[in-house]
A protein has these predicted regions:
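S-adenosyl-L-methionine
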Residues: 108-162
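Conserved class I S-adenosyl-L-methionine
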Residues: 81-92, 100
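S4-like RNA-binding module at protein N-termini
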Residues: 4, 20-79
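Glycine-rich SAM-binding Motif I of class I
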Residues: 94-95, 116
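Flexible, glycine-/basic-rich loop-and-beta segments that form/coincide
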Residues: 237, 243-271
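Conserved S-adenosyl-L-methionine
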Residues: 99-107
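A short glycine-rich, Lys/Arg-flanked "PGG" loop and its adjoining helix->strand segment in the class I
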Residues: 161-178
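Conserved beta-strand signature within the Rossmann-like core of class I S-adenosyl-L-methionine
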Residues: 174-183, 187-188
Length: 271
């Protein structure tokens, strides 16, 4: 049976946002096995890679904290996935997939360019179609046995401008989208600070203006905008956009962008 380091496994299962956090958490005795409560405190210890881990004493609502991003989006944009066929683009461990299932999705296509990341409980769920090593940039309608009416996007190291054209091909007319906008992967290199962090509110505003305009060009109306409740890698502020595939697409959030950025910076000013 294949084995993996405890800290790497804890990170892959979504217990921590970064490998470094996972390492520290293991050393602090925070990581235990779901099955028998066995505690692991040596980050480099190798254990079977199908060992389900959790944080000591904590009941996670979703398989990863990332699920809280989509949870917020469904609430603030008043969206429902009840009975829907959906796509989770950039599924990773499956936080967004878990949210969709817990909110009544009938079928979820969990798409990721990587492999062996989706949480075990989701792999076993008959409502989940795991599509690993799948580059969504080249997706076609025929790749999906049912037409999705809802999609979420949480991708890294790639611009949304490379994802939305493919999604437009695949998604049903009037289909809804929650897209995580990550300025660190949308801004020009000269706008990104040390360690890949963007702290300048003006850069955030510029990115949101250009991304929302691009979405309209690709056939998606932009109907809602807010900030993500969780910061991205290295503490980057990220944003949630609500899009809808429409024949006559429009940008309805343009006047709100500056205020959304201001709220985000107030929320995370001490972090």
């Amino acid at each position: 049976m294949a084995k993996e380091r405890v800290d790497v496994l804890a990170y892959k299962q979504g217990l921590f946002e970064t490998r470094e956090q996972a390492k520290r958490g293991v050393m602090a005795g925070l990581v235990v096995a779901v099955l028998n409560g066995e505690r692991f405190d040596k980050p480099g210890e190798k254990i079977p890679d199908d060992t389900e881990l959790k944080l000591k004493g904590e009941k996670l609502k979703y398989v990863s904290r990332g699920g809280l991003k989509l949870e917020k989006a469904l609430q603030v944009f008043d969206l429902s996935v009840e009975g829907a066929t959906t796509i989770d683009i950039g599924a990773s461990t499956g936080g967004f997939t878990d949210v969709m299932l817990q909110n009544g999705a009938e079928l979820v296509f969990a798409v990721d360019v990587g492999t062996n990341q989706l949480a075990w409980k989701l792999r076993q769920d008959p409502r989940v179609v795991s599509m690993e090593q799948f580059n969504f940039r080249y997706a076609e309608k025929t790749d999906f046995e049912q037409e999705p009416s809802f999609a979420s996007i949480d991708v890294s190291f790639i611009s949304l401008s490379l994802i939305l054209p493919a999604l437009h091909r695949v998604l049903a007319d009037q289909g809804q989208v929650v897209a995580l906008v990550k300025p660190q992967f949308e801004a020009g290199r000269e706008q990104i600070g040390k360690n890949g962090i963007i702290r300048d509110a003006k850069v955030h505003q510029h990115v949101l203006e250009s991304v929302t305009a691009m979405a309209v060009e690709q056939g998606f109306s932009v109907l809602g905008l807010d900030y993500s409740p969780i910061q991205g890698g290295h503490g980057n502020i990220e944003f949630l956009a609500y899009l809808k595939k429409e024949e006559e697409a429009s940008n309805q959030v343009a006047p709100e962008i500056e205020k959304v950025v201001e709220r985000a910076h107030r929320e995370f000013k001490d972090e």
